[in-house]
């Protein structure tokens, strides 16, 4: 058993968990980037005169933008939680 109280098995399990978290973080950052790009594209579409003067099209674009905004917030929340958990785990391993 290590001085920190973590057994070799615990350290191995935590390192595996850390790798999974790092992969998930990469996935989240990519999804966040894609969502931000799509939000920007929809804002540009909504700003076009032919779209904002067409109530149906403007409504559709606004709803899509709302959906993307909610998704972005959700992804950011998950990412922030993941980063905090990852940092705690790294601290535990550093003390091992």
Spans of features found by a protein language model:
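Charged, heptad-repeat coiled-coil alpha-helices that serve as long linker/dimerization "arms"
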Residues: 1-96
């Amino acid at each position: 058993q290590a001085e920190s109280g973590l057994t070799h098995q615990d350290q191995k399990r935590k390192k595996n968990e850390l790798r999974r978290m790092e992969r998930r973080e990469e996935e989240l950052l990519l999804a966040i980037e894609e969502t931000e790009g799509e939000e920007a594209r929809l804002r540009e579409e909504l700003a076009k005169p032919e779209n904002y003067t067409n109530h149906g099209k403007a409504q559709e674009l606004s709803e899509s933008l709302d959906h993307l905004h909610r998704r972005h917030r959700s992804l950011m929340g998950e990412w922030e939680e993941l980063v905090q958990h990852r940092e705690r785990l790294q601290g535990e391993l550093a003390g091992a």
